[in-house]
Amino acid sequence: MSANLDKSLDEIIGSNKAGSNRARVGGTRGNGPRRVGKQVGSQRRSLPNRRGPIRKNTRAPPNAVARVAKLLDTTREVKVNVEGLPRDIKQDAVREFFASQVGGVQRVLLSYNERGQSTGMANITFKNGELARRAVERFNGSPIDGGRSRLRLNLIVDPNQRPVKSLADRIKAMPQKGGNAPRPVKRGPNRKAAMAKSQNKPKREKPAKKSLEDLDKEMADYFEKK
């Protein structure tokens, strides 16, 4: 592993992919002796009839799958957990490798133990979900150091996380004051209400018309009092 100090992470992964393909071609099964099952007396040991293992439903709920897909399609940052990195590789080398192979690397956080040594684990934050998904598809399961270990990449997505609203959606403008503000429209009196109000008022009785004799009599009474 000390020879990896002079190599980049790109060279380590590239050489291991070629070596793993050659190992698969030459690893065919030979014509060795076959194993013979043990017999008890003249009969083979019979196994009890089993229906097979019980399959568990490991499928995620459709709501969670839809939420994860929606989060990956947005422009928000998405983290990827990487395990199996060579422990003599520095944090800057991890950043340079994924930035050149995938792009959009925002932050890289390499994990260290209490002695200050790398644990081979890192959290990489990508610019969006598409770049994070591309990194997982390309490098998940890639051999390291001649196939001694393999990279494991996992997306870190919280399906309960709500999408962040833009700043324009979260800020509301203050109401304008002064002449620019719209003035309230003045409405005239309601005719129906005015007519109903006038009808409810008691009508004043008009004084009866007086004759000339009544007027002369009132004049005579007025002068007599004086």
UniProtKB/Swiss-Prot annotation:
Subcellular location: Nucleus
Any Gene Ontology biological process: transcription elongation by RNA polymerase II
Statement: the UniProt record of this protein carries the keyword Iron: no
Renumbered residue ranges of the record's region Disordered: 1-62, 173-226
N-acetylserine sites (modified residues): S2
Alphabetic keyword roster: Acetylation, Nucleus, Phosphoprotein, RNA-binding, Transcription, Transcription regulation
Protein name listed in UniProt: RNA annealing protein YRA1
Record gene name: YRA1
